[in-house]
């Protein structure tokens, strides 16, 4: 991390299910910038373990965990957009970090690990959507090479009102 504290990144395993669910619930309660509200997650620990096992065994999808002092502090993942030939080159990236650890370099480390994985998996384009008001996330994504390619003014219908989404992509073959 920026302050010199060690941060360990590794692929999630099914044994991480309880901690990943805890982290998911916390991160999704701490901000209105993520896709879901905590209560919308219906995954049980067994469901999460099955999901993580599939990611662990996949050649083209992954969930990466960030640990500080043995505690899971954030996750990021790569998911194929689809299996059809015309879109097989594209993957989507998602990331969530506990608020206590924002601005400490974990996000950048997770992003770089995801980008490296996506390249090795053979993807040519990584995509993400970010709430336009999430300026720190937009700066992070731009810092690692993502560029805006569109906007959706009514992308999220949050409890607080409409949230504009910025559509971003990183071309991995350039």
Show the residue positions of the predicted features:
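A short beta-loop-alpha structural element at the N-terminal edge
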Residues: 7-22
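Conserved GNAT acetyl-CoA-binding A-motif
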Residues: 111, 118-129
């Amino acid at each position: 991390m920026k302050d010199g504290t060690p941060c360990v990144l590794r692929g999630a395993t099914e044994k991480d299910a309880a901690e990943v669910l805890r982290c998911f619930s916390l991160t999704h309660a701490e901000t209105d910038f993520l896709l879901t509200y905590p209560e919308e997650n219906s995954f049980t620990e067994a469901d999460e373990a099955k999901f993580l096992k599939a990611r662990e065994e996949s050649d083209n999808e992954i969930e990466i965990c960030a640990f500080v002092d043995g505690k899971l502090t954030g996750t990021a993942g790569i998911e194929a957009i689809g299996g059809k030939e015309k879109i097989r080159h594209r993957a989507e990236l998602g990331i969530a970090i506990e608020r206590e650890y924002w601005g400490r370099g974990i996000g950048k480390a997770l992003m770089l690990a995801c980008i490296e994985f996506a390249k090795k998996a053979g993807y040519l384009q990584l995509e993400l959507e970010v709430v336009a008001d999430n300026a720190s996330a937009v700066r992070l994504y731009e810092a690692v090479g993502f560029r805006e390619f569109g906007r959706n003014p009514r992308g999220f219908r949050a409890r607080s009102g409409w949230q504009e989404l910025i559509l971003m992509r990183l071309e991995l073959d350039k």
